[in-house]
């Protein structure tokens, strides 16, 4: 099976990233071993101003610290991507502040960093999109898709992900036709502006929002440049928790392949809490009832070209968790294939050492008795050579020498064992004689009478 790329990444700047800019986020994604990132284009702030005198004669890409998304000349929009477009006096500039970058140079630099680090970029349009609402809300939603496309062009992003909105009072068939018409206009505008990013339609997780998998496939089939975004937690919640086995995920992929011929797929994954066919909230993968292991088993078998974005509250942590699970399943499959090859087609290797021939059997199928070990040779004592004994006259043979007997070891006498010595008791300390201390009598005390020592009697002199 040919090798393909399965990419993992977070939906936004990683939580563990110390910096909060898109540059920091992309570098942190690469450091974590991930290779995809979905930039959140969720804040759209538009400002209008007249062109300054020093800007007359310049183009939209030459404006510093501002991103010009539209030029109104006589209250009519002018394409901002025309190479010969120059500002004139009285023009009104529409500038965008989105939190991703300040101007075109910032977007281009971010895209170059991602390309150097092999991090695939995508862009998520504002979450509140309602193509089936009132005319004002629908126009604002399509404008947000256009602005997202302009940013994606400078970033080099490959996908603009969007929701589609509520059904409202529209029947499902009528809602389908309206969505197709509006998305067709946006896609044609993308083509005129030479925006290569595809528009990804995300599956919805609630019954009141347009976006079942069948509706998305119908829209993508009728409008070119649109692809479905396989949001597995949304599909799992909308259908009542059906994605539990590897075969369940296989059915989803087979349905997409039958309808569309797509080389690369795009998806979201996380845990989800749901009730009555409606999504309640996203959860970490381990806390939801939809496990990643069945999807990993399918991916390891089919090896499709797909990007999986973590929508979990843990973002990059669950993205790394999914990558580890997939690698484990792949290693397990490789080990299984190698074992089967050994059983079926691998030749038996010869033994390293030759096998000894079997021993010959004796009579009646019994093995021969082992030979008795001979006596060890007697070493001759160093010194003079022993005299040769004369041979007998009768036979002419020398008499056999008797083998010298080894002296028998003396028998051990029954020596009574000595009793263990009794432990010595510690001797009493001898009193230490101290000289009498010469102390002065205290006043008022009685003097102590000293004992008289009798002197020894002198010897009497001898008489002469």
Show the residue positions of the predicted features.
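N-terminal pre-domain/capping segments
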Residues: 1-125, 131, 136-142, 146, ...
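Short, well-ordered coil/turn segments that N-cap beta-strands
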Residues: 4-8, 33-35, 115-121, 155-158, ...
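Active-site beta-loop-alpha junctions enriched in small/polar residues
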Residues: 11-15, 40-44, 126-130, 165-167, ...
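Gly/Pro-rich active-site loop or hairpin
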Residues: 14-16, 173, 210-213, 229, ...
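Conserved, mostly hydrophobic/aromatic
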Residues: 29, 124, 152, 199, ...
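Conserved beta-strand positions in the central sheet of alpha/beta enzyme cores
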Residues: 38, 161, 229, 268, ...
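Active-site acidic/histidine proton-transfer and metal-coordination neighborhood
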Residues: 115-116, 126-230
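Intrinsically disordered, Lys/Arg-rich low-complexity segments
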Residues: 350-464
């Amino acid at each position: 099976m040919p090798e393909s790329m399965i990419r993992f990444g977070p939906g936004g700047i990683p939580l563990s990233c110390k910096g909060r800019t898109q540059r920091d986020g992309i570098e942190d994604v690469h450091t974590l071993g991930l290779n995809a990132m979905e930039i959140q284009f969720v804040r759209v702030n538009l400002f209008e101003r007249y062109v300054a005198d020093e800007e007359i004669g310049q183009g939209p890409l030459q404006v510093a610290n501002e991103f010009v998304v539209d030029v109104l000349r006589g209250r009519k929009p002018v394409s901002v991507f025309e190479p010969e477009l120059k500002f004139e006096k009285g023009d009104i500039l529409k500038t965008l502040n989105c939190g991703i970058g300040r101007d075109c140079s910032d977007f281009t630099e971010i895209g170059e960093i991602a390309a150097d680090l092999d991090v695939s970029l995508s862009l998520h349009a504002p979450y509140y999109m309602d193509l089936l609402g009132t005319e004002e809300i629908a126009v604002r939603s399509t404008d947000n898709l256009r602005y997202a496309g302009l940013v994606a062009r400078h970033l080099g992003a490959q996908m603009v992900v969007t929701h589609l909105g509520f059904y409202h009072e529209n029947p499902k068939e009528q809602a389908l036709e309206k969505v197709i018409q509006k998305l067709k206009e946006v896609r044609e505008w993308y083509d005129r502006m030479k925006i290569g990013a595809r528009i990804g339609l995300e599956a919805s997780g609630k019954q009141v929002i347009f976006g079942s998998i069948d509706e998305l496939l119908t829209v993508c089939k009728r409008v070119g440049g649109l692809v479905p975004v396989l949001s597995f937690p949304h599909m799992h919640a909308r259908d009542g928790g059906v994605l539990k086995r590897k075969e369940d995920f296989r059915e989803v992929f087979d349905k997409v392949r039958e309808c569309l011929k797509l080389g690369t797929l795009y998806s979201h994954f996380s845990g989800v809490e749901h009730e009555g066919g409606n999504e309640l909230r996203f959860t970490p993968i381990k806390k939801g009832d939809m496990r990643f292991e069945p999807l990993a088993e399918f991916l390891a078998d089919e090896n499709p070209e797909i990007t999986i974005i973590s929508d979990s509250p843990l973002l990059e942590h669950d993205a790394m968790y999914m990558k580890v699970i997939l690698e484990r399943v792949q290693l397990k499959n490789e080990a299984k294939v190698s074992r089967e090859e050994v059983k079926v087609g691998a030749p038996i290797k010869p033994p390293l050492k030759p096998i000894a021939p079997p021993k010959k059997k004796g009579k009646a199928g019994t093995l021969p008795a082992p030979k008795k070990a001979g006596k060890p040779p007697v070493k001759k004592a160093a010194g003079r050579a022993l005299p040769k004994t004369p041979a007998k006259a009768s036979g002419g043979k020398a008499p056999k020498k008797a083998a010298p007997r080894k002296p028998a070891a003396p028998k051990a006498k029954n020596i009574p064992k000595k009793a263990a010595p009794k432990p010595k008791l510690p001797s009493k300390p001898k009193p230490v004689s101290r000289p009498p201390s010469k102390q002065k009598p205290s006043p008022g005390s009685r003097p102590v009478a000293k004992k008289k020592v009798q002197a020894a009697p002198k010897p009497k002199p001898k008489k002469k």
